[in-house]
Structures are given as structure tokens and as C-alpha cells.
Amino acid sequence: VRARAGMFLSFQTPEEIPGITLENFLRTAQNAITGKPVKVFAFRKELAQQMEALGMDPAYADRYLNVGFSGGEKKKSEILQLLMLKPKLALLDETDSGLDVDAVKTVAQGVKAYHNETNALIIITHNAKILEGLKVDYVHVLDDAHIVRTGGDELVNEIIEEGFHAVKEDEAK
């Protein structure tokens, strides 16, 4: 229902789904969203291109969804889903958690490839690095369930340079 409405949710800890390959999951989801069967050749071509852009081994398309994937592979799998399903609204819950520096860059590139004027993106993160290079409209810094600071690109840069702690301290002054 949410997917048909154009919504996508990325989980902090993606579930493993044995018995359904990544390719079959994505093709079935696209069929459900569009209401018509996707053309297999075109689908596989786009899937291969998106997987290559994310540095994913093409063999992952034939593996069960997230089963035996490392943490980084699960996050890339979710970004692949984002790119293939093209939702109108995406909520990414700590999609960068537990990733090494290179994987954060790859995930950030995937997020950047998705984001444009026709969709909305909400990113929950403890690491502002994933926001680098994205054109953000708003940044809200939360502390103890309260918004302590709001800004735009300038706030992203401030957080990257000084950290969340410094940004929260500035607000307390």
C-alpha cells in the first residue's frame, strides 16, 4: 500500500527474507507499483546499471533478499531498492550506520542519484557526511526528542566541521 502511494522506508537494520531473490523482489514491487508487468529485458538492464553504480556484484540479484549480506551490502541493497522503485517520498533511517568511509560515499552517491525536485527525502543520521553534496532544503538537529537547531546547507557544513555537539552547545548559549 505504501509503495503504491509512492513511499519508501529504509530500515536501520534491514530484514533478511529467505526464498525471495533480490531481483524477484524488485520486479514484483515494480509490477505492484505500476499495476502492469515490467519488461524483463529493460528491467534487468536497469538493475545491472544501478548495481554497477553502487559497486554491487551482479550475483547479488540472484541471492535471497539480504540473506547473508554484510551490513554494508544490506544498506546498498536498500539504496538499490530506492533507485529501482523511484518513490515520491523516501525515509532513510540511519542508512549510513555501521558503514566504512567508502561505503558511506557509495550510499551517498546513490541517495544523490535518487534525489531531485520531484521527490522528497527525509534522512535520519548521526553522521552528516552522508549529506555532503546533497541539496538540502532543511536540516533539523534533534536532541532529547526536541529540535534544537534548524538550518540549511550552511548547517550541514557547520556540523561536518564542528560536530553535532558544538552545534547543540551553540544553541544552548
Residue ranges and their predicted role:
Residues 1-8, 114, 159:
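ABC ATPase NBD coupling module
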Residues 125-127:
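H-loop/switch region of ABC-family ATPase nucleotide-binding domains
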